[in-house]
From Swiss-Prot:
Transmembrane segments: none
Known function: Facilitates the functional incorporation of the urease nickel metallocenter. This process requires GTP hydrolysis, probably effectuated by UreG.
Family: Belongs to the SIMIBI class G3E GTPase family. UreG subfamily.
Disulphide bridges: none
Entry protein name: Urease accessory protein UreG 1
Entries under CDD domains matching the protein: UreG (cd05540)
Gene Ontology terms: biological process: urea catabolic process
NCBIfam families recorded: ureG (TIGR00101)
GO MF, one example: GTPase activity
Keywords attached to this entry: Chaperone, Cytoplasm, GTP-binding, Nickel insertion, Nucleotide-binding
Species this protein is from: Methylorubrum populi (strain ATCC BAA-705 / NCIMB 13946 / BJ001)
Entry's Gene Ontology cellular component terms: cytoplasm
Subunit structure: Homodimer. UreD, UreF and UreG form a complex that acts as a GTP-hydrolysis-dependent molecular chaperone, activating the urease apoprotein by helping to assemble the nickel containing metallocenter of UreC. The UreE protein probably delivers the nickel.
Phylogenetic lineage: Bacteria, Pseudomonadati, Pseudomonadota, Alphaproteobacteria, Hyphomicrobiales
Length: 204
């Protein structure tokens, strides 16, 4: 099902601990029986996120590739994406019929974005535990990503966050761009994210 232009590449960004790896796992589980898929993770000095996906059984080990970025993680997805482009090329070599590549960035700040050369669609994950004010802080991930995921809604009562305020701020910051409120550890909201990828990415 791969297109003549190669597989659909989906970039998943967001701060450390926001739930990027949880989203990767949920998406792998939903797509692995429908599409030829692989996952690429970015960590500064380790391959921990790749290990987590492997241990969780999200995909076969050979379909998960960990990239050690070193230094500043946003450089590897934006200013100099060569290390990730090489990882995509390696996975295409291993699996010539790839339909979908999920690329998880290393945890970074709200200003991190994916190079258009690397990702066709960008998802950005923030979490309720970071505080009710996070959506209104803005930044490219919040305002310009193709889909914003506000994760860990189950923690709202514990951190004193008002989800209605967060949703209002999200709508104000994003305009007509879509968003999903989710609790990814339980899988809540993951189906909506998967549907968005299929529809926005033109997967069949």
């Amino acid at each position: 099902m791969a297109s003549l232009n190669g597989p659909l590449r989906v970039g998943i960004g967001g701060p450390v601990g926001s739930g990027k790896t949880a989203l990767m796992e949920q998406l792998c589980r939903r797509f692995r029986d429908r599409y030829e898929i692989c996952a690429i993770t970015n960590d500064i000095y380790t391959k921990e996120d790749a290990r987590i996906l492997t241990v969780a059984g999200a995909l076969p080990e050979e379909r998960i590739l960990g990239v050690e970025t070193g230094g500043c993680p946003h450089t590897a997805i934006r200013e100099d994406a060569s290390i990730n482009l090489a990882a995509v090329a390696e996975m295409r070599r291993r699996f010539p019929k790839l339909d979908l590549v999920l690329i998880e960035s290393g945890g970074d700040n709200l200003a991190a974005t994916f190079s258009p050369e690397l990702a066709d669609i960008t998802l950005y994950v923030i979490d309720v535990a970071g505080g009710e004010k996070i959506p209104r802080k803005g930044g490219p991930g919040i305002t310009r990503s193709d889909l914003l995921i506000v994760n860990k809604t189950d923690l709202a009562p514990l951190v004193g966050a008002d989800l209605s305020v967060m949703e209002s701020d999200t709508q104000r910051m994003r305009g007509t761009r879509p968003y999903v409120f989710a609790s990814l550890r339980e899988g809540h909201g993951a189906d909506r994210v998967a549907t968005f990828i299929v529809e926005a990415g033109g997967l069949r």
